[in-house]
């Protein structure tokens, strides 16, 4: 990732550029954690979800709006560089799944487990939380999730 970010800066040759880092994206299109958990809540008697990996779930519509407001139609030109854009707050995959279950009014138990108890083909970082210090903060991840599930019942 870092090499790609450096390549962008080099390729721009001094012209303004922006690299946006984000995490744990979900939205109305494609496969994502919210859609998967919603489906599994209806299919499985219980869900086991890792509780020791931390991040900031980010609603794609919030991200798109922030990109438009800050980079495409900004009030003032920003300095070139790397910007973090995620919904505010930090959670675990387990807490994220629990919140989805609560908002969906599901009675399927969601059980916390350790990463080591959930085999994945690729190792995941324990902390992928990004701190947004250069731009206005986006709404809390729970508010974004609630809005998403009201607007796009998956």
Locate predicted features.
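NAD(P)-dependent short-chain dehydrogenase/reductase
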Residues: 7-55, 61-62, 68
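Short aromatic/basic micro-patch
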Residues: 19, 57, 90, 112, ...
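An accessory alpha-helical subdomain
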Residues: 23, 49, 54-58, 83-96
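Mid/C-terminal beta-alpha module of Rossmann-like enzyme folds, strongest
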Residues: 66, 73-121, 126
